[in-house]
Design a protein with these regions (language model features):
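A glycine-rich dinucleotide-binding beta-alpha-beta segment and adjacent secondary-structure elements
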Residues: 148-160, 164, 380-441
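Helical element adjacent to the flavin cofactor pocket in flavoenzyme catalytic cores
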Residues: 174-224
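N-terminal FAD cofactor-binding segment of flavoenzymes
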Residues: 27-63
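Mid-domain catalytic core of redox enzymes
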Residues: 185, 215-329
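Short, small-residue-biased leader/transition segments that mark boundaries at the very start
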Residues: 2-3
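C-terminal segments that line or cap access tunnels to active or ligand-binding sites in enzymes
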Residues: 284-392
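Rossmann-like flavin
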Residues: 69-167
Length: 471
């Protein structure tokens, strides 16, 4: 029964792909749009190999604008396709054509590290450590001295938990390049990806179980023996692949000599990204016109989120509209995401969902009002359309996705110390492997690639890459 059991601690499968119901409405947890899904592009190729591409209900976002940026009383559009992206921004920055050309070439070169051509040649990814050691903000500044353009190019940094003096150009480029290739929304919620994958796993003889929280990883004679589930049941296994945060994985391990204290303290010392406060607005019928692009609002001259400076405020947010059902021209759910560190909700650290008390409810109400006020500054007067409001905080992320500190993206990759935040898929303990958003890059693309790197430890990289590339 090797590699055949998958355990999920929650009722719902899928981590950030979870879609939950509130009052007849679907809410997505984390994946609001996905890139590189056009024919021949990398996510399309992976999903085709997994056998799920033709089963997904997706909607291609607008080519002319898939991300709209509000910055300093002006509006800038990210258009799909590298050329179109460049031409569109040239309307606003006519003297920056050559610099935009250089920027596009730079992010493309990072995106090309994981092309389908590499897969066909038997390589999952080309080595990109140089880009991990390059600052995202620094790279943008080296391309253009125009402050406004620098900020417009960094305006979607919420997607990777952007921190100005830490974020790597690798993450910035990998994620932005993916959306420039093609950007899609899920029409029936992002959880369909998890559900389709589960069908495939089961069809291939695997077992996927929910409400099975791993509470201990068993080790004997410096080798994995299996896991304990919900503090009671023992499941024996030869291998364990953990997609938990490495800090959590290490805390579950039985005592052993293979994993050195120095490694444990390095992992413990790593900083985690900020979390997200999400405001889900359930809209009245036929009231809020659907827009087939995301909106990023920035209230400050500097678009990067700063922990100390912005604590308790809303300096920026992302707005994502749910694709309407049927032929309706109106959206039923609008999600608004804004950065928030765990510090802001630390008072309620020891509580569980639905039992956090009145003060927590009040905190969420005040934050909601602050965000709605922020939206009104940009002309989004939606109060008359709102039927109901549902919110989540970093605590919700912690309790439903098991992240440390309620972090949205896990371990912060710091370009100044790329090796320190780099975690390998293989551990020093025999038959324990790691995967998930804390290794390499987070997000649908990053996690897929990391899963492949983990699997290649079992079947070999060349074999696996060619299987995917020729799917």
């Amino acid at each position: 029964d090797v590699y055949k059991r998958q355990l999920e601690k929650n009722e719902l499968f899928g981590g950030c792909f979870q879609t939950y119901q509130r009052g007849g409405h679907r809410m997505d947890t984390g994946i609001h749009y996905i890139g590189s899904l056009d024919e021949g592009q990398i996510m399309n190729q992976y999903f085709r190999y997994f056998g799920i591409m033709d089963k997904l209900s997706i909607k291609r976002m607008d080519e002319e604008v898939f991300d709209r940026i509000y910055y300093k009383d002006a509006i800038y559009d990210y258009a799909m396709g590298h050329e179109r992206f460049m031409e569109t921004l040239c309307h606003s920055f006519p003297h920056e054509r050559e610099n935009l050309k250089r920027y596009v070439a730079a992010i493309r070169s990072v995106g090309n590290l994981i092309s389908t051509d590499h897969l066909k040649k038997g390589r999952l990814s080309q080595e990109g450590m140089d880009f991990f050691a390059t600052s995202a903000a620094g790279m943008i500044a080296s391309v253009t001295t125009n402050r406004d353009l620098q900020n417009v190019l960094a305006a979607t940094s919420l997607l990777y938990g952007g921190i100005k003096n830490k974020s790597t150009f690798y993450e910035h480029a990998m994620i932005n390049n993916s959306y420039l290739e093609s950007a899609y929304r899920f029409t029936e919620g992002s959880m369909q990806v998890s559900l389709e994958l589960i069908h495939i796993i089961r069809a291939n003889g695997g077992t996927v179980l929910n409400r099975k929280e791993v509470t201990r990883i068993l080790v004997k004679d410096e080798a994995i023996q299996g896991v304990e589930v919900n503090h009671e049941e023992i499941l024996e296994s030869t291998y364990v692949i953990s997609n938990l945060h490495p800090q959590l994985t290490l805390s579950l391990l039985d005592k052993n000599h293979s994993i050195k204290p120095a490694f444990v303290s390095r992992i413990k010392s790593l900083e985690n990204s900020y979390g997200i406060f999400t405001l889900n607005l359930m809209m009245k019928k036929d009231c809020c016109p659907y827009q087939n692009h995301n909106i990023y609002l920035h209230g400050n001259e500097d678009v990067w989120y700063e922990k100390e400076m912005h604590k308790g405020n809303t300096p920026s947010c992302m707005i994502s509209m749910q694709v309407p059902r049927g032929n309706s021209k109106f959206t039923e759910v609008v999600s608004i995401l804004t950065p928030m560190y765990m510090d802001e909700v630390s008072k309620w650290t020891d509580t569980t969902p639905e039992h956090r008390g009145e003060a927590y409810r009040q905190f969420k109400e005040e934050k909601t009002e602050q965000i709605l006020q922020f939206l009104r500054r940009f002309g989004f007067h939606w109060n008359h359309c709102i039927e109901k409001i549902h919110t989540t905080t970093p605590l919700s992320y912690r309790d439903y996705t098991g992240t440390i500190d309620g972090s949205a993206y896990g371990i912060v990759k710091n370009y100044q110390y790329p090796q320190i935040s780099f975690v390998s898929t293989r551990t020093k303990l025999k038959n324990l492997f790691l995967t998930g958003q804390n290794l390499n890059v987070h997000g649908a693309l990053g996690v897929t690639l990391t899963a492949m790197l983990t699997c290649s430890e079992f079947v070999g990289q060349e074999y696996l890459a060619k299987k995917v590339g020729n799917a």
